[in-house]
Amino acid sequence: MIKLFLTDVDGCLTDGGMYYSAEGDVMKRFCVYDGMGMVLLRQAGIPCGILTSEQSPIVKARAEKLKLDYLYLGVGSKNRQGSLTKLGAALRVCDKLGITLKEVCYVGDDINDIDVLSAVGYPCCPPNARPEVRAIKGIHVLKTPGGQGAIREVTDMILEGRE
């Protein structure tokens, strides 16, 4: 049974595009269906969180709006001199909750997600994920692209499985 839901941001919660203003400000587009899916999971007692390699105030604001339980900014796939990896962050959350990685659903789309996707019990990726990600043994390739409701597709499957 899934006891924790974690996801990457770019390419999963967003379409992977980055919008820049003339002043150099960055904007990201999030799908409201994905946000509602995580709200519904939290209401069902399943904590939710984000693991991203970016240090993004946009992502922080989105996580706060959704009242997500966990937010790890600036975590990558490789340990950079004292920095936490995505897998390390996932393990830290599991330790806090007293669960194993096999009870975690993670959605990722790029090579910096491979370690986490290979370790969790329910790995998922949008169809726009990198070929290396789609090739992970046991991964569930979603029908919906990132940023267009991919996360909602997963959260609905999790909730339907609990009924």
What does each of the following model-derived ranges do?
Residues 1-84:
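Alpha-helical substrate-recognition element adjacent to the catalytic core
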Residues 65-66, 70, 76-163:
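Mg2+-dependent phosphoryl-transfer enzymes with acidic/Ser/Thr/Gly-rich catalytic loops
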